[in-house]
Amino acid sequence: MKRLPDSELEIMMIIWDLDKPVTRFEIEAQMDQGRRLSPTTVLSFLSRLQEKGFLAVQKSGKNNVYIALIDRESYMQAESRSILKRIYRNSARNFIAALYDGDSLSD
């Protein structure tokens, strides 16, 4: 599974949060106020996500509706495994040691 750049991941997080097929307009409405993107930029990200196999697109009247093909949990698992492999050389022990900085752990 391809790793997503932050901008595309932001779009996918919105789609996963809405948990239904969505239009570009619904995605734009959910974006952070300080992070407004132009409609063409959002469409560009959606097109890339479709090319990468993360989204399917269907026509609904005049609008395109975007459907997640990869669920959040699958992506997060793949991303976690990738981080563990790339940074911690597949060692959960090294990963846990990096999280623990000498202070007591809390819940």
Residue ranges and their predicted role:
Residues 9-14, 26:
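Pre-recognition alpha-helix immediately N-terminal to the DNA-recognition helix
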Residues 43-47:
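Short, hydrophobic-biased segments on the C-terminal half of alpha helices
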Residues 53:
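Glycine-centered, phosphate/nucleic-acid-interacting loop/turn motifs that mediate DNA/RNA or nucleotide
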Residues 21-31:
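Short acidic, hydrophobic short linear motifs in intrinsically disordered regions
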Residues 3-7, 60-79:
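Short, cationic-aromatic polyanion-contact patches
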